[in-house]
Each structure stands twice: as structure tokens, then as C-alpha cells.
Amino acid sequence: MPRKHLIASGINKKQQQQAKIWMKCAKEIKAAAKMGGPNPEANPRLKVAIERALNNNLSRDSIERNINGASKDADNLKELTYEGYGPNGLAIIVRALTDNEQRTISAVRGYFSKLQGQIAKPNSVSMLFNEYGQLLIDKKTKTLDEWFELLVDQDIVDINEDDEIIEILVQPKDFSATKLILENNNANIQSAEIKLIPTDFISLDDHARERLVRFVNACENDDDISWVITNYEEEL
């Protein structure tokens, strides 16, 4: 009996997590469609938002409803960016989509306080990041040099590899074209998104890392927060 209860509890928690992801995907689609129009081919942000939603199993019907309802439903949504610092000078950017700015800033301040960090002035932290299109593909189909030759006409910022993955960074304007070239050449794309990439990385001791993990988890569990990014050297 207790075991069944634990299984049911685990299933319910997983369903709640999935519902939260879908809600965030829907909010991003609405905001992207309102800001850049309903055509994903002419709106790179919307195209990325749709792909992320599909990767998280949000139905196409739900995606269409959110695009079509963007002009009405997104009126109350406001996009906010909070910049700040954590332990050891850790640079942090938090992006939110919210219909209640006071609620969101109050929550974000609380998260920074528990991290023993502080919110900084606008643009004081963003200078430590560059916005690039990042594409991660596995190495099974072609070598790094072969991919580089295929992408030579794109504005590639960097291309590197580890034992399993090739990472390609491009300017945002070339993101869609680069992704299409990869798809047309049978690349196994593990991840594709336009994101902020730190210009440099820092390390943390174990105690500070634990606080950072709690901070990131709190942000990810907040319905108003779309994403959080830092210049910590490890992936959490």
C-alpha cells in the first residue's frame, strides 16, 4: 500500500512538472507572436518557441490556439529581465513573463537573498554575455571539419567538440538557416536555441554551488520565470 502511494505521488508530481513546462511554453509563444507576428518563418523567436514546445510534447492545437490568441491574451504579459550577482561574483540573468510585476520582483528578490546575492542595475551584467544561436549535434554523421565546410557561408562564431557532441555557435540572424542546413544533411540535433552565452566562466565552492542549485530550482519552479542563466562553469 505505501509503495502504491509513493508511485501515485511520483506520477502526480511528474504531471505537475509537465503542466508547468507547458504553461511556460504557452506564455513564451504568446509573447513571441505578439512582439514579432504570428508567422514563425518571419519571427525567429516564435519559431524557436514552437520548436521548444513541440520538444516538450505540447500539442500543435495548443500551439495554434496560443498563437491565434496572442494579441488578446498577451496584452497583460510583460517581459522583464533581472540582472544580478551571486557568490564569488557569479553573473546571473533572470527572464520573466508576468502579468503582475510586483509579485515577480518580490519573488526574485527573495531568491537572490537566499542565494546571498543581489540584484544589480540594468545592463551591468548582460555585458558579460553574448546572444548566439547554439546548436548541439552528435558526432555520428559527420566530423567537425565536414560540418564546418558545409556551414562556411554562415556567420559562425565558434565550433568545437567533445567526445560525443559538436557545438556550433552562430549569429542569431543565421540561426534558422544554419539549422536547416544541419537538418538537410541528416544531423542528429540534440539542442537548438538562441541563448545568452557567457564570455567567461567562474567556479564555486561546494557550499556556494548548493545555494546556486536551490536558486535555479526556485526560479524554474516559479510560473512567471521563463529562464535563468549564469556564468557558472558547470551545467546544473
Swiss-Prot record:
Coiled coil: none annotated. One of its GO terms (molecular function) is DNA binding. This is Probable transcriptional regulatory protein UUR10_0292. Transmembrane segments: none annotated. GO terms for biological process: regulation of DNA-templated transcription. It comes from Ureaplasma urealyticum serovar 10 (strain ATCC 33699 / Western). Belongs to the TACO1 family. Gene3D superfamilies: 1.10.10.200, 3.30.70.980. Keywords: Cytoplasm, DNA-binding, Transcription, Transcription regulation. One of its GO terms (cellular component) is cytosol. PANTHER family: TRANSCRIPTIONAL REGULATORY PROTEIN YEBC-RELATED, TRANSLATIONAL ACTIVATOR OF CYTOCHROME C OXIDASE 1. It comes from the Bacteria. The lineage of its organism: Bacteria, Bacillati, Mycoplasmatota, Mycoplasmoidales, Mycoplasmoidaceae. It is found in: Cytoplasm.
